[in-house]
Amino acid sequence: VVSYASIFSSCTKLVFVEVNRLEDREVIKIIDTCSDVTKENITKSPKLRKLLSIPRYLMYLLENEEQRGSISNVGELFEFIVDSSIDETLKKYDKPIRKENFKALVKRVIERIAFIMEISRKDKISKDDLYTIIDELKGNMAHMLVANFDLLFFESRILKETNGILQFGNSEIQEYLAAKELGRQDNIESVLYDVAVQKELKHIYPNWYDVIPHLSYSKDRSDSFVNVFKLITAYESHLENETFESLLRYVNPSTLGAQQRADLFSNLFEHYQRVPAYIKWRGPIENLIQECY
């Protein structure tokens, strides 16, 4: 083992700055300056509050609020965070690449990575695993990314690196990106059955309960969300109420068609006929039932 004690002992007058997470009360104070719609969306995601305790991500929230106004759903904020992280990386990355072409490629690649990590039920991968994923991609741009492999964890802005192990900065960013990749599949319900259901026990792997809600706030994927939700309730007839309600935390009935609202109402009605659970007065579930009725 090489000792660096002698090297450090020769250094004098060193100055460093340590950036710590913000305390919860400080984060709340800053979030309170945002619009009511933004605050409501942040409240829906317990993991998002923890992410915003990191100063860099809190700055992204404020930049988004300043540039675009309120966020209509958490997906808009996650998309802004991902875009900003990639932009910052490309700005500081000093290798000669066509940066304007790389952003879209990097986004698609990290969505694929997140999807594969969810299938594997992992929140961390090795550099070898990452290289294998990238190497299997097709096209000239993918080969360019292989040649600039370190871009994906440069300064830990896109993927966070710790001793050669890589992960996303926050588990919900991984879940959001995985949901985007899932949403691109031709038959989402069939794909989800293949990757998320334990066939012998007819049991859905728990990590997908955090991925699936991100399908619900996109108008393009809301129909698939309702079908996926029906699939889950069919397999998990004794689903705990907390998990059941968590799946619905991002649902916006205004993005649903009449038949989708009717199907969702039927699922809600049947669930609360079976489960002796209290529905909070003027809470999100009661509002959802009213709007779907």
What are these regions (language model features)?
Residues V1-V2, Y293:
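Accessible peptide chain termini
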